[in-house]
Amino acid sequence: DWGAPVVWSIASHHPTRCHAVANLCVPYATLERGYEACLPLLDRSVYPEDEYPFGQWDYQVFYEEDFARAIQPMDANPTNAIKVVSRKGMPEMRGKVWRTATIRRDGGWFGGAAEAPELPLDAVVLSEADLSVFVAALTRNGFFGPCSWYMNHERNAEYSAQAVNGGRLDMPVLFLIGQYDYTCECVDSALAEPMRALCSKLTERTVTSGHWMAQEKPVEVNAAILHWLATAVSDIWPLPTAAA
């Protein structure tokens, strides 16, 4: 999620510090350049411009337009908010309008409700123990900090423009696509094309998951990373064992 633009920014601004880079769901040269950089890459067969000008990034515009209202229903009930958001991938939604594309039209998150609705825990993505940790942290600190990522697009774009080597990444790069990730939709749209143009040693793999890939399919994610390390980064992995 928002960790991905941070990782991409480290690699693009400090390539001599990065032997290789692996990332999930959010492709390079997209959100770290601001959501406006993603708009030309939308699948307009799903999101006609006259009806969905911001496509599935509509929710990010909502944060900019009314930040306090965007976080209010999450702060009102962190438990429900986390359970609503933390859901496994939905194969049946491919090619359909995703819920994040209508947030402003719907009057805000959760249809403009004062708080998130009650849903059963999706144990495929989140355990009761994990839920308790997240709820405790967000009850204590609120959603202001995490959601403030959405208020920094302009500065992120300015920083991204300072990347060295024109933003090219020449180290080995692994990118894992979520087949059912309809926020960072890379299967049918052009969202990953800038990454493909800028990464000279790119490996892509598709995982049958939604947006919360690492939680939903941890075995598949770890297997993909290990295989890539052993094949694309074999000069440093595995580390040589010390002589007895």
Whereabouts are the PLM-identified features?
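Catalytic active-site module of serine/aspartate enzymes centered on a nucleophile-bearing elbow/loop
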Residues: 199-244
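Flexible "cap/lid" subdomain of the alpha/beta-hydrolase fold that forms the substrate-access gate
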Residues: 4-202
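Catalytic nucleophile serine of serine hydrolases
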Residues: 1
